[in-house]
Amino acid sequence: MERVVKTEDKNMVVCEYTFTKDEIEEAEEVALRQVVNRVEIPGFRKGRAPKQIVRSRYPETVKSEMIDFFWQKIVKQIDEQENMLLPPILVDFELSNNRARMTIEVHRLPDVEIKPFEDFELKKVDKPSVMKDYIERKLKELQQTHAILEPKEGPAEYDDMVRVKMTITTDGKVIMNQKVSEYVLYKEDDRPVVSEIVGKKSGDVVEFDRDFGEGKVYHYKIEIEQVNKRRLIDISDELAKTVSAEYETLEQLKDAIEREGNELYEKEMDEFLKTQALDSLVKTSQLLVSERTLSQLVETVFDKIRRDREEYEKLLKDHDNNPEKLREALKNYYITDMKETYSIRKVARENNLDVSEDEVQNEAENLAIAWGISVERAKSILKSRNDIFEDVRWELLKRKVAELIVQRAKIVDVKPEELQNEGKEAQKNEDN
């Protein structure tokens, strides 16, 4: 079998395979045996008919079996020599007594071109600006939390705290029965459980209905047990002492908040930089993929979606009932997904980054917290579920790649407002 590359376009190669006379004879012999064992010819026992009779009676069947024989040989060679993104595609074939030729599309895994990490610019929010805002915000939260409550006889006003008994019914069923709740009547909260209470006094009963659609109407009955006026303590030494006995002065409280803020800042900035690193990697990498490959990927999934009428109509509606817009969205999805997958793999391969089984198992403690199960149960799941194991391994590999990029990239400090403005501008461009 001789292989000749006819054309090459990035990851796609069109190859012509030509078979020798001996291979043609072998293919015919195998094909005839297959057909002889399947067909019944009058006058002969099954599997005993002469090959020349089978050849003359079933020429197209024999030809089809020969093509399958050649196809299997080609696919085996491709599997051994290539890393495939798509199964091989038969483009053309020629089969005669003394000539056998097949033209095949081979779609390899695409490569990516990656910019030097030193060219990446990652943004880190200016720490002093963040800490100043964090301390101010935290002090105001503590001021609200430790407000002094003073019972009042008059009607409830905004910023008062109320204690109520709430009963909710629907369709004759009791959903909530006299549940005691305490909450603050904030002016910006327009829910009826707030707005309907303002102006009412202790001992009053408020009733109203809420329609949440789909024929579901809920009846609320709220008994007001207590109205309290909230007096905010000045942000001073008095507030510090109220928060905890370990603080004597406001400065001590501020120092404690700053230490807490520093720890949060470092964790959040670490994650923020790593997220930017991977985003920059994906955005700046060039995917070397043929349009023909993308077309094949899109049409394959498009046909699959179309077979599910409900799913197809839903997706079509999301894309202005335009099949071409849906195809374009699928294409963009594949481009982004492949850029991420293959750029991360390439960086990991070129920098000897890997994730061991022990490293995956060590994630069990974090997973246990996220999943709400024991650490031992999380470890058991990682051992028994290869799909989950591989998902965790992939996330850890992404983390290592991100850390490598952060080490080499240029990091610049920006003010929080600069970052907010950039985010608004990016959202505006995305909407347009």
Swiss-Prot record:
Reactions it catalyzes: [protein]-peptidylproline (omega=180) = [protein]-peptidylproline (omega=0)
EC number: 5.2.1.8
UniProt keywords, alphabetically: Cell cycle, Cell division, Chaperone, Cytoplasm, Isomerase, Rotamase
Location(s) in or outside the cell: Cytoplasm
UniProt KW Cell division keyword: yes
DNA damage is among the record's keywords: no
NCBIfam families for the chain: tig (TIGR00115)
Full protein name: Trigger factor
Species per Swiss-Prot/TrEMBL record: Pseudothermotoga lettingae (strain ATCC BAA-301 / DSM 14385 / NBRC 107922 / TMO) (Thermotoga lettingae)
Gene: tig
